[in-house]
Amino acid sequence: MAELEFEKPVVELRNKIRELKDYTKNSQMDFSEEIRILEDKLENLEEDIYGNLKVWDRVQIARHAERPTTLDYIEHLFTDFFECHGDRLFGDDAAIVGGIAKYKGMPVTVIGHQRGKDTKENIRRNFGMPHPEGYRKALRLMKQAEKFNRPIICFIDTKGAYPGKAAEERGQSEAIARNLFEMAGLTVPVICIVIGEGGSGGALGLGVGDYIHMLENSTYSVITPEGAAAILWKDAGKAKEAAEAMKITAADLKELGVIDEIIPEAKGGAHRNLSKQSENIDLMIRKTFEQLNGISKDELIEKRYEKYMKIGQVSFSNASIGIK
């Protein structure tokens, strides 16, 4: 498993423990006490490192090459998944996957950004950066879900929508804007979960819902830290400073009222334990459906509208702006 820079002390200690255990198996010497001491030290070290993650550490975890993807969670959370392809206008975009599935026996529509697990798949899926046809495919599935009264679950995991010439020619901004408009008025429940990076309009194109949740080490921002640093300071190398200033973590966004709940992750990140992470997401989905149960279509849309009207509100007292 690939290690991140801040994890090196933990990885080195784990390797020492493993080597000592292997040596003990092949010798007559007993190192059980030494192993116990090292394991206690490892537990304390993990608590110290993973319990005090900096913003940039979380950015690295969110981008981890082995972080679970939409299809991983679909496999663990749903049954009878049937993937649907194409936007019926131009083509199919592998950077967004979606289809019909069952959640605890209930028909649902599941949609999400999809990154690759290796170079070949990343190229096929454009590194999880959708073209307009991806967003139009997603909208087609959402409108189908509305027609057949199926709840929608969206998994968000993208650096952003693809900014290439072909995407712009085919109406990238219109496709995203159309999704924002249409999702705001859907008459079925919509649950959105940020599972990795939630980057810019590319994330928002699947991000208008009744409840917005984030995994503990995911990020959600208007631009990547590197992009913000390049614009503000003409130096992408200041990405760490930008990340700190941008308030992009789940804890920051929960405090700001942008998201509803934070889904806990395994120590070190979701990639450490996919089964446990899927259980944590499952608990949150069940809880959210319970909260949405019994709400009429009109009330659903009204509450969704009120939710988004509250985001970003700023109030000033006369004293704070110098008015007597």
From Swiss-Prot:
It catalyses: N(6)-carboxybiotinyl-L-lysyl-[protein] + acetyl-CoA = N(6)-biotinyl-L-lysyl-[protein] + malonyl-CoA. Its main location: cytoplasm. Its EC number is 2.1.3.15. Acetyl-CoA carboxylase is a heterohexamer composed of biotin carboxyl carrier protein (AccB), biotin carboxylase (AccC) and two subunits each of ACCase subunit alpha (AccA) and ACCase subunit beta (AccD). Component of the acetyl coenzyme A carboxylase (ACC) complex. First, biotin carboxylase catalyzes the carboxylation of biotin on its carrier protein (BCCP) and then the CO(2) group is transferred by the carboxyltransferase to acetyl-CoA to form malonyl-CoA. It is found in: Cytoplasm. One of its GO terms (cellular component) is acetyl-CoA carboxylase complex. This is Acetyl-coenzyme A carboxylase carboxyl transferase subunit alpha. It comes from the Bacteria. It comes from Bacillus cereus (strain G9842). Residues 37-291 form the CoA carboxyltransferase C-terminal domain. Keywords: ATP-binding, Cytoplasm, Fatty acid biosynthesis, Fatty acid metabolism, Lipid biosynthesis, Lipid metabolism, Nucleotide-binding, Transferase. GO terms for biological process: fatty acid biosynthetic process; malonyl-CoA biosynthetic process.
